[in-house]
Amino acid sequence: MDKSESTSVGRNRRRRPRRGSRSAPSSADANFRVLSQQLSRLNKTLAAGRPTINHPTFVGSERCRPGYTFTSITLKPPKIDRGSYYGKRLLLPDSVTEYDKKLVSRIQIRVNPLRKFDSTVWVTVRKVPASSDLSVAAISAMFADGASPVLVYQYAASGVQANNKLLYDLLAMRADIGDMRKYAVLVYSKDDALETDELVLHVDIEHQRIPTSGVLPV
């Protein structure tokens, strides 16, 4: 065997461990892919039950009270000038108001900022007289009297402020579905004009079960 053949054989011998070393990562990669797929399936399963801002559950992941369900309505405020106010009475569907004596336990407002939202808003819910025209002056006075909790919602770089819900408890008031027309959601645009494509409010009204609500989520 000449010198060149000896050198070639030596190189081949040195390469064998390298070929073996390449097979080990392939096996590890396969195991990693299997594990990744399992984790992905687990995340999807968990995400399906994880509450988000749009998830149709009352008060995040909390269930309704026994014997209760909820009806949701969506409000989209019109343009509100800087320092001005907006009010909208709670108008439930006829299929719900038909059972006007069913008790209401609580109202929750969930603030859903849209892509263009860059403002600061104050949100509350109040019982207002039937004679009230929800004028700017009337709404301003209701924000100032401190008689109702107020949610201050500000722009967040993440897209959703950590606290985006306001809960209004009505158990002690013995309010019923028929009373809901006496309540209104009020919005104050503090620092900037609120445009029509910046904000949506989801209002969840928890009330005693009615025959037509059997298919609603609880």
Swiss-Prot record:
One Pfam family named in its UniProt record: Cucumo_coat
Organism per entry: Cucumber mosaic virus (strain E5)
One annotated GO molecular function: RNA binding
Protein name, entry field: Capsid protein
Domain notes: The N-terminal arginine-rich stretch does not seem to be the major RNA-binding region that allows formation of an infectious ribonucleoprotein complex.
Signal peptide: none
Family in the record: Belongs to the cucumovirus capsid protein family.
N-acetylmethionine PTM sites in chain numbering: 1
Function: Capsid protein. Probably binds RNA and plays a role in packaging.
Annotated region described as Disordered, given as residue ranges: 1-28
Keyword Ribonucleoprotein assigned: yes
Sequence ranges of Basic residues compositional bias: 11-21
Keyword tags: Acetylation, Capsid protein, Ribonucleoprotein, RNA-binding, T=3 icosahedral capsid protein, Viral nucleoprotein, Virion
Location(s) in or outside the cell: Virion
One Gene Ontology term, aspect cellular component: viral nucleocapsid
